[in-house]
């Protein structure tokens, strides 16, 4: 109960600067917008444009990440018998490592480019997730889970940098709307795949591999995009 209150308070406090500083813009009428056709032009021109492929790739690896975050706690309790206290400690540890990773990733983003950061982060998450699958010690699980969290921060920030660079100023609102939608539209997919595979196989380890599969497909799609930066 207390956590919900503090999260709401945190959200309110850090929304105030945006509410104060955001510029007012005129709202266009429906006849001026042609919203659907504008969105279509944004992602499709005789085939999927670069931004369209990126949004699909991002949707898939975001689903994989969502499955890891949502189902990771269930996996930890079911396979490694973590207590509630240990689970909370792991959550705090992974959040701290994600923040550290985001700071480090921001520095290397300027040096290497956003696409390389996303690719390296995906590889880091995939490899650490595979190591988690084959871990039979609670200590190794905690180590690999913390490493996993280290790459979650950079991939989220770098993905936003990529989409902002791909959009011209007048397309920013539509583009980020699609970006947000691509991360939420199929957010159920990862957990459903993990749950279904776990139920069919009778193994949480095998079920968890569905999240890794989504990450790999998203990574392969990224390789199709040239000059992403």
Predicted region positions:
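A membrane-interface helix-boundary motif in multi-pass transporters
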Residues: 1-9, 196-215
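Helix-to-loop junctions at the C-terminal end of transmembrane segments
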Residues: 101-113
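Structural signature of the two symmetry-related core transmembrane helices
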Residues: 116-131
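Short amphipathic helix-loop junctions that connect adjacent transmembrane helices
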Residues: 70-87
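Multi-pass alpha-helical transporter architecture, strongest
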Residues: 10-21, 209-229
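Juxtamembrane intracellular "pre-TM" segments in multi-pass secondary transporters
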Residues: 23-56
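Intracellular juxtamembrane helix-capping segments at the cytosolic ends
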Residues: 154-167
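Helix-loop junctions at membrane interfaces in 12-TM secondary transporters
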Residues: 133-145
């Amino acid at each position: 109960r207390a956590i919900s209150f503090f999260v709401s308070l945190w959200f309110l406090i850090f929304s105030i600067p945006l509410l104060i500083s955001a510029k007012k813009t005129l709202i266009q009428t429906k006849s001026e917008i042609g919203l659907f056709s504008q969105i279509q032009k944004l992602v499709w021109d005789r085939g999927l444009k670069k931004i369209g492929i990126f949004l699909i790739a991002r949707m898939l690896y975001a689903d994989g990440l969502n499955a890891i975050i949502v189902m990771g706690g269930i996996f930890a309790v079911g396979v490694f018998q973590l207590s509630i206290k240990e689970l909370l400690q792991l959550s705090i540890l992974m959040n701290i490592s994600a923040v550290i990773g985001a700071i480090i990733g921001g520095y290397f983003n300027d040096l290497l480019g956003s696409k390389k950061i996303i690719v390296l982060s995906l590889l880091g998450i995939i490899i650490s997730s595979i190591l988690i699958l084959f871990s039979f010690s609670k200590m190794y699980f905690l180590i690999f889970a913390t490493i996993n969290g280290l790459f979650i921060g950079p991939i989220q920030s770098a993905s936003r940098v990529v989409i902002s660079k791909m959009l011209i100023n007048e397309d920013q609102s539509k583009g980020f709307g699609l970006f947000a939608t691509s991360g939420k539209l199929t957010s159920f997919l990862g957990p459903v795949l993990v749950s279904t595979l776990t139920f069919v196989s009778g193994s949480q380890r095998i079920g968890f591999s569905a999240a890794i599969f989504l990450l790999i497909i998203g990574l392969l799609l990224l390789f199709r995009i040239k000059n992403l930066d």
